[in-house]
Regions:
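Structural preference for beta-rich elements and adjacent junctions enriched in aromatics
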Residues: 190-230
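Short beta->alpha connector loops of Rossmann-like oxidoreductase domains
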Residues: 9, 107-108
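Extracytoplasmic electron-transfer domains, predominantly the class I c-type cytochrome c fold
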Residues: 1-57, 113-179
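Short, solvent-exposed loop/turn and secondary-structure capping segments
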Residues: 14, 37-40, 63-68, 102, ...
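Electrostatic cytochrome c docking/interface patches
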Residues: 62-93, 185-189
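Sequence/structural segment immediately N-terminal to covalent heme-attachment motifs in c-type
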Residues: 79-104, 111-118, 174
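A residue-level signal for beta-strand positions that form part of recognition/binding surfaces
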Residues: 97, 123, 194
Length: 230
């Protein structure tokens, strides 16, 4: 609902609900992995997308192109075994992140979550890279840790009032750790996600465990977490 101006993935500051124009442009251009939102860069020109960004902002009467408050990245910390180990400790310390994402980052903690509308939500399984809404790059993960996700239970860990607040350096360490969890997942190969029909003579087996199916080429059925519930 563009009239609510509820933009979850943005690069503006923690207390700034309005996104940068580039944030909206990126979502239209690249889409959102793990959702029904496709990328339009193969269909719309760059100017078309810019025009669409300006049009979408009208619904919520957004005038700023680049709000004053922006994310403070400080000095980016490159991923390393030491940084990942430090992020691992911070992730689990006081159940800072594991309270929702689970001890192994699989989103399997028992805490029941609801978004601001009261709908049931599920924490991200951080070991499945194809479900990340933006990307698995540490810089994008740092943004989520810093700003939180508007309208959801994902908080900002840059909030000075939070008992679980992280410094800029600590946020980079957690981002590197989370990126390492994503890298441990097995990506789905795009060429294996299309079901290719093969013409056969005679009848097909009626039972799913029939040995005749062993001769069929395997296909990956690409499932995405599009769950809505209360």
């Amino acid at each position: 609902d563009f009239t609510e101006a509820l933009y979850k993935f943005k690069t503006t500051g923690t207390d700034e609900p309005v996104p940068n124009d580039d944030d909206i442009l990126r979502m239209i251009r690249d889409g959102m992995p793990g959702t029904a939102m496709p990328g339009w860069k193969d269909i719309l020109s760059e100017q078309d997308i810019i025009d669409l960004v300006l049009y979408l902002k009208i619904f919520a009467e957004i005038e700023e192109e680049k709000p004053e408050e922006q994310i403070d990245y400080g000095t980016e910390i490159a991923s390393s075994p030491e940084s990942i180990a430090a992020g691992d400790k911070l992730f689990h310390e006081g159940e800072r992140c594991s309270e929702c994402h689970g001890r192994d980052g699989r989103g399997d903690a028992v805490k029941r979550l609801k978004d601001d509308s009261g709908a049931r939500t599920w924490p991200r399984n951080l070991t499945k890279p194809w479900t990340y809404r933006v990307s698995t790059q540490p810089r994008d993960i740092y943004r989520r840790i810093t700003t939180g996700i508007t309208g959801t239970q994902m908080p900002s860990f840059a909030d000075p009032k939070s008992k679980k607040k992280l410094s800029i350096e600590e946020r980079w360490q957690v981002a590197n750790y989370v990126a390492s969890l994503a890298a441990s997942g097995q990506p789905v190969r795009a060429e294996n996600t299309v079901i290719k029909a093969v013409r056969v003579d005679g009848d097909l087996p009626a039972q799913p465990d029939d040995r005749a199916w062993d001769a069929a080429a395997p296909t990956t059925v690409f499932m995405v977490p599009q769950i809505v519930g209360k």
